[in-house]
Regions:
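A short acidic, amphipathic alpha-helical/loop segment
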Residues: 21-25, 138-142
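Membrane-embedded segments
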Residues: 4-6, 10, 18-22
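Short acidic donor-binding/metal-coordinating loop in glycosyltransferase active sites
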Residues: 11-14, 130
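Short, basic, helix/turn surface patches
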Residues: 14-17, 21, 67-70, 104, ...
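Active-site environment of divalent metal-dependent phosphoester hydrolases
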Residues: 16-18, 81-83, 132-138, 158-161
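C-terminal domain-boundary segment and adjacent tail
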Residues: 1, 68, 118-120, 140, ...
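Solvent-exposed coil/turn segments that connect beta secondary-structure elements
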Residues: 14, 38-40, 79, 156, ...
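Metal-dependent polysaccharide deacetylase catalytic core of the NodB/CE4 family, i.e.
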Residues: 4-7, 27-136, 167-169
Length: 188
């Protein structure tokens, strides 16, 4: 059962700071949180002995520990589409790319990420977190085709529990140094 005004705490990219800083706070306060790691980053850092909190990403072992606690769950943030360059912005279609090629690329990426979660002892994610918050109708169609039942974007708005679709859920970004009271006031 949810409180009258529930707050969902989410983290994108799967930074190691989720494990080092957020996980102890979740344990201390009994809070539940969501992290959406980029699966290729977790794959990479699981194979390295590099755990620098300033730049490293969550390993599969760390995610299993966090998931087992019941305080964290993990959602899909793509396998390797968290890029912002001249060729592509996140999961958006490139200029000149055919719809068939775009669909093939997305489905392969989403399925590879989903498989890695399961292969590494985690539940298959049910939510897709858009890299950079970038989305469009075609992308949403493919997200649904892959079986996701919710998406997290970056549009700042309050979500209401209505029983309606859980696609395009809004969130409020809290950059470093930003007073949490400002976000809570925005969400009123």
């Amino acid at each position: 059962e949810l409180p009258e005004k529930p707050i969902m705490i989410t983290f994108d990219d799967g930074n190691r700071s989720d494990y080092v800083y957020a996980f102890p706070l979740a344990k201390k306060y009994g809070m539940k949180m969501i992290s959406s790691p980029v699966a290729s980053y977790s794959e990479q850092y699981s194979a390295l002995d590099d755990h620098n909190v300033d730049y490293a990403h969550l390993t599969w072992a760390e995610m299993r520990e966090m998931q087992t606690s019941g305080l964290f769950e993990f959602q899909n943030h793509s396998y390797d589409l968290h890029r912002f360059d001249v060729n592509r912005k996140g999961c958006l279609k490139r200029r000149g790319e055919t719809e068939a090629s775009y669909r093939s690329l997305l489905l392969a990426d989403f399925e590879k990420s989903q498989a890695l979660f399961v292969e590494n002892g985690l539940p298959a994610p049910i939510c897709f977190t858009y890299p950079f918050g970038s989305t469009n109708a075609l992308l949403l169609q493919y997200v649904k085709e892959c079986g996701f039942s919710a998406t997290l974007g970056t549009y700042e708005h309050v979500n209401h529990l209505t029983g309606d679709s859980l696609f395009d859920l809004g969130r409020f970004n809290r950059p470093h140094g930003y007073d949490i009271r400002r976000i809570l006031n925005q969400a009123e």
